[in-house]
């Protein structure tokens, strides 16, 4: 078994001084400080029970933090922002958009963009992945430089002992600082959660906005109906840009239309053209066609705003076609052969995304039809109804009538190592209580599987990803051919890449 060596744990989760050492300006020090800005599972549970949801005050606070690091919201306009919200596919849409712009940049046919920024979440292996320049994660050196720029500006503004913005807010501030400092002239920004009150929604005059496919997710924060969620997501629509979306449920579409009208803009529904086929794009899955066509429309709107619109069908443009073909977005319908095992990685973590993953996997029968060991490695930790998510995956898998029958199912936490705990850049305090991983979610999933599937497969719980991989390797030793599907969360997918020591970018 080839796995990466556990990395030294940099922190003690029980310490009130988490992340404050070493004091030197190193990447390790930056990660320590960043991790100190997370909330643990107990705090998040209290907030959920209180019904504390994002509101206007969230944006007041974010504007305050932006001013503390030396910027006004109007300063963000120079980045020519493409802003993307949605439940399913917003990350892929951002990746397609960035890839197209990179190919246009490479062609030299247009004067813009000279520097492309992209901000997405979460990351797979390294937090550097969240902030990209020209299609590549920023280096650890650049991350360290800009991290401490922001950290020290905040301390100078409010004092070293004052409360700082939480993890995602801090990284959002840092992304703005990186992009402005590096003279980015096309910034693709993925919303974290929702839209109206999301930390990214300080942009006053975006070049283009889009809401991808909608579904029920983060209901404790965004609302219990598709209409409520649509209202939140459409909060990114602004008067300065056409409001784009894809085909939606009628109740969602009505809300999007009304929200666009409120912002004095018009809603444009993008439908994949007949000439766009799965073999033209670099990410697997029929569900990517909608994300692809949204990305193409975002690029069109970007250049309309820049004053140099396309004068031909974009699907006949070589640079756009190359952007679709050469897109790189790891951990999404990704197939690899590692240690003589066929692996399928997909970080789907919503009902809609997991159903789409199941449908895609059912269409890839050649991956597992000869395998006598067929393993599902699944993780869910923080969503409202993890069993419903697992059911959605199985629904997609079984809907074709030719779905895979798993011989083994492993429900794992997203803790990386059994001795060292989390890999520092994968730390997720919001799934930890008293320095221990929260296992009850995995135990509930395992119990449901056993009750629903009986003895058709062997179901177990793994306290860490390392132990889950050890179980996979043990099964492999007794099998001729082994297939593993890793899904349920990007945190699990990234952790498996770490344990298997696989590069992402």
Swiss-Prot record:
One of its GO terms (biological process) is tetrahydrofolylpolyglutamate biosynthetic process. Its main location: mitochondrion. It is an enzyme of class 6 (ligase). Coiled coil: none annotated. Pathway: Cofactor biosynthesis; tetrahydrofolylpolyglutamate biosynthesis. PANTHER family: FOLYLPOLYGLUTAMATE SYNTHASE, MITOCHONDRIAL (PTHR11136:SF5), FOLYLPOLYGLUTAMATE SYNTHASE-RELATED (PTHR11136). This is Probable folylpolyglutamate synthase. The gene is met7.
């Amino acid at each position: 078994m080839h796995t990466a060596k556990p990395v030294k744990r940099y922190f003690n989760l029980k310490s009130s001084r988490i992340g404050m050492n070493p004091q030197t300006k190193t990447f390790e020090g930056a990660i320590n400080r960043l991790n100190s800005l997370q909330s643990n599972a107990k705090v998040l549970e209290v907030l959920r029970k209180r019904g504390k949801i994002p509101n206007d005050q969230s944006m007041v606070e974010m504007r305050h933090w932006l001013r503390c690091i030396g910027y006004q919201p109007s300063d963000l306009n120079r980045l020519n922002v493409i802003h993307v919200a949605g439940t399913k596919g917003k990350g892929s849409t951002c990746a397609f958009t960035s890839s197209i712009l990179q190919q246009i940049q490479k062609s030299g046919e247009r004067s813009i963009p000279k520097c492309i920024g992209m901000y997405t979440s979460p990351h797979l292996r390294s937090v550097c992945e969240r902030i990209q320049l020209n299609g590549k994660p920023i280096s650890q050196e650049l991350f360290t430089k800009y991290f401490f720029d922001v950290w020290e500006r905040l301390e100078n503004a409010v004092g070293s002992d004052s409360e700082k913005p939480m993890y995602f807010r801090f990284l959002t501030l840092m992304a703005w600082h990186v992009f402005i400092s590096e003279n980015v002239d096309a910034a693709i920004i993925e919303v974290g959660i929702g839209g109206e009150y999301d930390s990214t929604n300080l942009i006053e005059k975006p070049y283009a906005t889009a809401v991808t496919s909608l579904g029920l997710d983060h209901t404790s924060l965004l609302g219990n109906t598709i209409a409520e969620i649509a209202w939140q997501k459409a909060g990114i629509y602004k008067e300065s840009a056409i409001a784009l979306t894809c085909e939606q449920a009628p109740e969602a579409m009505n809300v999007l239309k009304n929200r666009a009208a409120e912002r004095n803009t018009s809603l444009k529904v993008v439908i994949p053209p007949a000439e766009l086929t799965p073999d033209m794009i670099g990410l697997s899955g029929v569900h990517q066609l909608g994300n692809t066509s949204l990305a193409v429309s975002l690029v069109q709107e970007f250049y309309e705003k820049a004053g140099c619109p396309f004068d031909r069908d974009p699907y006949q443009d070589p640079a756009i076609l190359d952007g679709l073909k050469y897109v790189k977005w790891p951990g999404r319908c990704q197939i690899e052969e590692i240690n003589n095992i066929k692996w399928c990685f997909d970080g789907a973590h919503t009902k809609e995304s997991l159903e789409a993953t199941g449908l895609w996997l059912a269409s890839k029968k050649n991956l597992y039809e000869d395998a006598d060991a067929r393993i599902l490695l699944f993780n869910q930790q923080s969503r409202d109804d993890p069993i419903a998510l697992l059911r959605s995956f199985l629904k997609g898998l079984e809907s074709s009538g030719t779905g895979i029958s798993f011989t083994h199912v492993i429900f794992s936490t997203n803790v990386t190592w059994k001795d060292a705990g989390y890999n520092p850049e994968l730390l997720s305090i919001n799934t930890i209580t008293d320095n221990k991983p929260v296992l009850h979610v995995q135990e509930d999933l395992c119990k449901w599987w056993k009750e629903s599937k009986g003895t058709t497969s062997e179901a177990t719980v793994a306290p860490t990803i390392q132990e889950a991989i050890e179980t996979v390797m043990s099964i492999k030793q007794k099998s001729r051919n082994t297939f593993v599907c890793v899904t349920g969360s990007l945190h699990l997918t990234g952790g498996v890449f770490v344990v298997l020591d696989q590069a992402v970018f």
